[in-house]
Amino acid sequence: MMRLRRLLERMLRRCCFRDCSVRLTKSLCFKKLIEFDATKNQIVTKLQRLKKKFNNAVKNARKKGQTEDEVEYAKESEKKRFDLSIMIWGSNGVLVAGKSSKKKVAPKEMKPEETDAKVVNEGLSIGREMVPFGSSCGLDESKLTTGWENVEDGAEKREVEEKWKKFKDKLFELLYERSVLMNKTEAMMFKAES
């Protein structure tokens, strides 16, 4: 367990994207980070099992109506593993479960509810999104997060947060299109080999 946790920590330091397990299957860049002998298949299998454990923990927590802070662990190492898994496969520290059913169900039409909702300050999550981008540009992470926390709540801050959300959505769309294109390319290569 200790070796796997170290591997995950190193993966997080090495890459800033959340598709570490996908990148691992495509290259052996993480092979150098491992202190023990393991084949590519063993590493991939280990990561797949870890992701499955993470998804199961998320599903169980959701069934119980718990958040990530309320989930109880038998061992401290399990908590550390779960925290690392959230950083890799989670979404801004929010528990995300995969689709449980394989059937496609037609979505029900929902009428938008009219409520007096207050704007929730999501500055911390926006600050987290800025940190990887800023650190890749050579900016100090701690100054970015503390600087964003010091900005007063207001219309201008909400406008910037909305722009970051739109940017994040566009980035996800681009990553999805890239994975579809990669899948199509691999299918063409496989077809050419056979």
UniProtKB/Swiss-Prot annotation:
UniProt GO BP: regulation of DNA-templated transcription
Domain of life: Eukaryota
Pfam families named among the record's database cross-references: GeBP-like_DBD
Cross-referenced InterPro entries: GEBP, GeBP-like_DBD
Annotated keywords: Transcription, Transcription regulation
Presence of the UniProt keyword Membrane in the record: no
Keyword Transcription regulation in annotation: yes
Similarity field: Belongs to the GeBP family.
Name this protein carries in UniProt: Probable transcription factor At4g00130
Organism name: Arabidopsis thaliana
